[in-house]
A protein has these predicted regions:
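N-terminal Rossmann-like NAD(P)+-binding domain of SDR-like oxidoreductases, especially those catalyzing
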Residues: 1-147, 190, 196-200
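Charged, solvent-exposed alpha-helical segments that act as regulatory interaction surfaces
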Residues: 19, 54, 153, 171-174
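Glycine-rich "substrate-gating" loop/helix at the edge of Rossmann-like oxidoreductase active sites
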Residues: 114, 145-159, 174, 179-190
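Residue-level signal for alpha-helical context at structural boundaries
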Residues: 66, 78, 166, 183-184
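Alpha-helical substrate-binding/gating segment
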Residues: 147, 163-175, 186-204
Length: 204
């Protein structure tokens, strides 16, 4: 994207590192929470990719108020900028909204909210619908399943399973699987990026 567009990046770096960015983008980073930014130094936005979130389900149970406040206020701010600039939004929702629904369930009408994080994501989807209904701002929410790829940490108690497995294999440590009958869907980060770009092209 940065080869074809002028980008504005916003991240408080509470997770991740500026070193994960290409060197050409590091000076373009605004190191703040999006909800704390009053205005952007630009006259036009072609589109917004919204990935800001506290994305750990276990942490959302431990720090319920902080987690939910962060997830909702950041998203509301994004839709506010979307309204101001008439900019479409592609945002990350989550497979967590499905909970333990059986296979074949109606994905539009049925949900099984089992955590504050899942409720946050479902609420954000409803804000997106409201924003379109009232302000005519277009958006696409992607209910992502277990994204993995380079740059993930494996040493946090809230780390995803694939980086943990890789870390333990590199250290010649056993891979611990409780039960062994669980099934999960995973998607590689490059595939997510491609879908997000295609989604943005569709609604611009």
């Amino acid at each position: 994207l940065y080869k074809n567009y002028e980008l504005i990046l916003v991240d408080d770096l509470s997770e991740g590192s500026v070193m994960n960015l290409p060197s050409a983008l590091r000076k373009k980073l605004i190191k703040k929470k999006i909800q704390n930014i009053k205005k952007l130094n630009t006259k036009k936005l072609n589109g917004i990719f919204h990935l800001a979130a506290q994305a750990s389900v276990p942490l959302s149970l431990i720090e319920f108020c902080k987690s939910t406040s962060n997830n909702l206020t950041s998203s509301i701010k994004v839709f506010e900028f979307s309204k101001k600039y008439s900019a479409p939004v592609v945002y990350a929702s989550s497979s967590a909204v499905y909970g333990n629904l059986p296979l074949g369930s109606d994905e539009i009408k049925k949900f099984s909210v089992l955590s504050p994080y899942a409720q946050d994501k479902l609420t954000i989807e409803n804000y997106a619908k409201m924003s379109y209904k009232i302000f005519k701002t277009s958006s696409v929410g992607l209910r992502l399943f277990n994204v993995y790829g380079p740059g993930q940490t494996a040493t946090s108690p809230y780390s995803a399973v694939i980086p943990i497995f890789i870390y333990r294999m590199l250290k010649n440590l056993p891979i611990i699987i409780n039960g062994g009958f669980q099934t999960r869907d995973f998607i590689y980060i490059d595939d997510v990026v491609n879908v997000m770009k295609k989604s943005m092209n569709k609604i611009q």
